[in-house]
């Protein structure tokens, strides 16, 4: 596993010399001997717990300073130290990939491999921490999103409940109005039936008035006597009684 892949964020390289003098006593080299690599990895493993997330630049700068001042290593910048460790770990991964059972190694190579094993384990711990942190953060973000959606759903449900209540209220009033309309229609039918009955009675009375012959009993002159008037009154009553009895059987035809 390559060390750069374990880092969460790339940092700006700090190439300024850690030595207070403009020309350091030991020139910086890009290639270290096996002994120098072991010294460097010893420092890395010794301070491995000081490497924390988002502080890798500070860690490599400290290792470079200690290696340069205490161990005499020809590295005195953060970027040079980082690159040397990355190179050592890359070669270590290649050796692991091509290692065969029973392959002979020197004690120095074994020590370097052991130091690389410890450093790789530390990087794995940091990777697990980062993944756990990121997963936890994603869960928090998801929880916030879920809570926001639940809030919106609750508001929408309340609006739906209000609409349902209004529909039920209007439906009840519509039903009441339908019942009232049916009652009004029934009353109208009764009124129409009564009007029809009254119209029949009016037609009946009108027919009776048309069937009475007043000319047969009317006075023939202006000098008619009082006896004739009295007789005509009595006769008219008798005739009307007879007419009513004779006309009534024929009313059914009308």
Swiss-Prot record:
An example Gene Ontology CC term for this record: nucleus
Main location: nucleus
Gene Ontology terms: biological process: chromosome segregation; gene conversion at mating-type locus; mitotic pre-replicative complex assembly; replication fork arrest at rDNA repeats; site-specific DNA replication termination
Keywords linked to the UniProt accession: Chromosome partition, DNA-binding, Nucleus, Phosphoprotein, Repeat
InterPro entries: Sap1_N (IPR048592)
Chain intervals for the UniProt region annotation (Disordered): 1-30
Compartment(s): Nucleus
Compositional bias of kind Basic and acidic residues: 1-10
Stretch list, region 4 X 4 AA tandem repeats of G-[ATV]-N-M: 221-236
Sequence repeat copies, ranges: 221-224, 225-228, 229-232, 233-236
Residue(s) carrying Phosphoserine: 17, 19
Biased composition (Low complexity): 16-25
GO molecular function terms noted in the UniProt entry: DNA binding; DNA binding, bending; rDNA spacer replication fork barrier binding; sequence-specific DNA binding; sequence-specific double-stranded DNA binding
Note: Present with 20000 molecules/cell in log phase SD medium.
Described function: Binds to sequences required for mating-type switching. Makes a simultaneous contact with both the alpha and beta domains of the switch-activating site SAS1. Also binds to replication fork barrier 1 (RFB1) located within a 78 base pair sequence near the 3' end of the rRNA coding region. This leads to replication fork blockage. It binds the consensus sequence 5'-TA[AG]GCAGNTN[CT]AACG[AC]G-3'.
Comment field on protein domains: The N-terminus may contain the DNA-binding domain. Last 40 residues of the C-terminus are required for chromosome segregation.
Subunit structure: Homodimer.
Protein name, UniProt field: Switch-activating protein 1
